[in-house]
Amino acid sequence: MISTFALFWALCIVCIINMARYYSSLRVLLMILRDCDPLLYQYVDGGGFFTSHGQPSKQIRLVGYIYAQRYLDHHDPEFIRRCERVRGQFLLTTALCGLIVISLIAMMMWY
């Protein structure tokens, strides 16, 4: 029989790996954004996005921009492709984090 704790930790490791992939894809997206749309890059604070003085409201703007699929009208196909990839990874990571929370609650109730 598979251990519940082993399964939970495996799920956590998969989630952490997907978070790292999401972070990496977001960095590449910002590099592409700097070249193809400097105004949007400034609008989402691309230069300070991953720094300690980054502005969360501007970071949320980029997440909202990608989540609402407003990138579909953009002129650069590479940017559109990267946004679709980041959106997919964001949805996957969100679902995995939700599954971890549900699993943690279930384990606390079970044990």
Curated annotation (Swiss-Prot):
Cystine pairings recorded for this chain: none
Key words, A-Z: Cell inner membrane, Cell membrane, Membrane, Transmembrane, Transmembrane helix
Subcellular location: Cell inner membrane
Organism: Pectobacterium atrosepticum (strain SCRI 1043 / ATCC BAA-672) (Erwinia carotovora subsp. atroseptica)
InterPro entries noted in UniProt: Universal_stress_protein_B (IPR019598)
Bilayer-crossing regions: 1-21, 90-110
The name this protein goes by in its record: Universal stress protein B
A Pfam family annotated for this UniProt entry: UspB
Assigned protein family: Belongs to the universal stress protein B family.
Topology in the lipid bilayer: Multi-pass membrane protein
